[in-house]
UniProtKB/Swiss-Prot annotation:
GO MF annotations, alphabetized: 23S rRNA (adenine(1618)-N(6))-methyltransferase activity
Primary localization: cytoplasm
GO CC annotation: cytoplasm
Subcellular location: Cytoplasm
Key words of the record: Cytoplasm, Methyltransferase, rRNA processing, S-adenosyl-L-methionine, Transferase
This protein's name: Ribosomal RNA large subunit methyltransferase F
Chain spans, region Disordered: 1-48
Documented EC number(s): 2.1.1.181
Coiled-coil regions listed in the entry: none
Keyword Kinase listed: no
Catalytic activity: adenosine(1618) in 23S rRNA + S-adenosyl-L-methionine = N(6)-methyladenosine(1618) in 23S rRNA + S-adenosyl-L-homocysteine + H(+)
Protein's gene: rlmF
Similarity remark: Belongs to the methyltransferase superfamily. METTL16/RlmF family.
Amino acid sequence: MSKPAVKSVQSATAKTATRAVNIRQKVKAPKQAKPEGKGSTKPVKDRPRVEIKKALHPRNAHLNGYDFPALISAFPRLKTFVRPTPYGALSIDFADPLAVKTLNAALLKHHYGIGAWDIPQGALCPPIPGRVDYVHYVADLLAEGDKSCAISKARVLDIGTGANGIYPILGSQVYGWQFVASDISAHSLTNVQSIIEQNPALQGRISLRLQPDDKAVFKGIVQPEERFELTLCNPPFHASMAEASEGTKRKVNNLQLNRGSSVKAAPKLNFGGQAAELWCQGGERQFLATMIRESQMFADQCLWFTSLVSKQENLKPCYQALAQLKVDTVKTIEMQQGNKITRVLAWSFQSAAKRKLWRAEHLAR
């Protein structure tokens, strides 16, 4: 994607909302599966991948829930939205978009040093604990246990950064990564540019690129001779605006039922999202198919390609597509946040030996 005159930011799609204040995660034992051979050069077969089931990542700052007194101290405006629950804990109304946006602003300020963060009305408001979990797991994926690896030197591409720019913000603040963030929406990128300009800690760390082709993923964004250690993406998973609206209503109704409200209440929600953030032709499955197909064009320019996969049934066609491309290594990381389960699908065209050489050349301490 060509850079717009003004640094642009991409539209990331964040589609989950967390109701529980104290996020309690159960660690599930991993399923017994035949492990993949490290560095195997055999084509990937269509078989279940080893899935790592865990609670929030051990390095996740939100592992023990939200410390509302500390968050209010850092961001006093949050106090307006905090109420005691019937169980004696503090919480907010997670169906109130303004409350959720204010909580995000408080979390970003208290934990990540971001003093100014805002999104346009109707834009996707991401759950911070789940988003930073993705960042932590791909950081481990990149290092592969190599203690000589300085992952802070990594260059990362965020596909569809959205108006919130959450992955570049978290990745740059937690690990010091350099980001290219792309999006098909100039409006979204303009908002991310505004966030960058208001936060000195982000300046010089995030480059924004507008994707001129709404049917492309990497084409038009990755430049010749450019190198990335990681790509990140939270793809739109609905196939139409009508489907996205139905999904939103379902989530709102579930929240209202859980808190004892009438399901006929007006559907105010934190499951916002502009069109490009929520749906695309063919939905998540088609988006992932395009991403996998295009990744082959940049096989030697990127060490690890990764994406969130919201729908379990979309994994099998992804495995089949990767097998056809003779991808060297495929990994699936299952993440759980409350009742929400999502997966990180990761693949590399490089063998284990080549990945080690890549780290030695580009990420050595």
